[in-house]
Amino acid sequence: MTAIRKKSLALTDLFMALCASRCVTFGLQNVTPTDPRYRGSHVSLAAANDGYAMMQALIARGVIGDFRRGDAAGEPDLLRFGFTPLYTRFVDVWDAVQQLVEMLQNAEWKRPEFNREQVVT
C-alpha cells in the first residue's frame, strides 16, 4: 500500500470516527463502508431530510462537500465529503467536523438562505 493510500484511509477513518462520536445525536449516519477495501477517499453521511440546506450551511462555513438528493422510495439525502491525501491535513479533518457540529448545534441549515435551491451547471 502506498503512503498516499495510507493517508487517504487515515483521513477518512478519522472523519468517520469523529462524526460517529460527535454527529450521531443530530441524526447523521455514516453510509460509507468501514472496511478500507471497499471505500475510496470519500465519506457519505445520510441525513433524513434537509441535506441540501445542511450542505449549503457548511459551504458558507468554508467546508466544501457535495450533496446527493434522496429519492421517493425512502433513500436519504447524502452529504458527501472528499479527502485528497496530497494536501488535506489531519487538522483540516478536525476543523471540518467542528464546523459540522457547530452548524448542527445552531440549526443553521434552517435559515432561509440555505433553503433556496441553486441551479447547478
What is each stretch, according to the model?
Residues A60-G65, R69-T121:
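PLP-dependent enzyme catalytic core of the Aspartate aminotransferase-like
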Residues L45-N49, F83-P85:
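Short beta-strand-to-loop capping motifs
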Residues L14, L18-R22, A57, Q99, ...:
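Alpha-helical structural signal in soluble globular domains
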Residues D50-Q56, V91-V93:
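Short, conserved charged micro-motifs
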Residues M1-A47, D66-E75:
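Conserved small-domain helix->loop->beta segment predominantly found in fold-type I
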